[in-house]
Amino acid sequence: MVRYRVRSLSERSHEVYRQQLHGQEQGHHGQEEQGLSPEHVEVYERTHGQSHYRRRHCSRRRLHRIHRRQHRSCRRRKRRSCRHRRRHRRGCRTRKRTCRRH
């Protein structure tokens, strides 16, 4: 999961104002029914809000690349032929790879 930046006070006040307008349209089904005091509203938004955290969908290639870096050193990298890449055929790249760690 990726955490977003902390919102500024102006963004929070605008969001609270928008929630109040939305709550008036629905009636009293907002924060009063849940029994939240104004001090606990911010904590509730942090823990139950969906705006702070976003699920990051990892592709299989990205996961493989991340875990390969953890377990293998750059010297033991496995060589593969250009025919192995069947999805993206961009031609053979014979450029020598250099180690990025050093």
UniProtKB/Swiss-Prot annotation:
Skewed-composition ranges (Basic and acidic residues): 8-17, 39-48
Keywords: Chromosome, Developmental protein, Differentiation, DNA condensation, DNA-binding, Nucleosome core, Nucleus, Phosphoprotein, Spermatogenesis
Region called Disordered, residue ranges: 1-102
Positions carrying Phosphoserine: S8, S10, S37
Compositionally biased intervals (Basic residues): 49-102
Stated family: Belongs to the protamine P2 family.
Protein name: Protamine-2
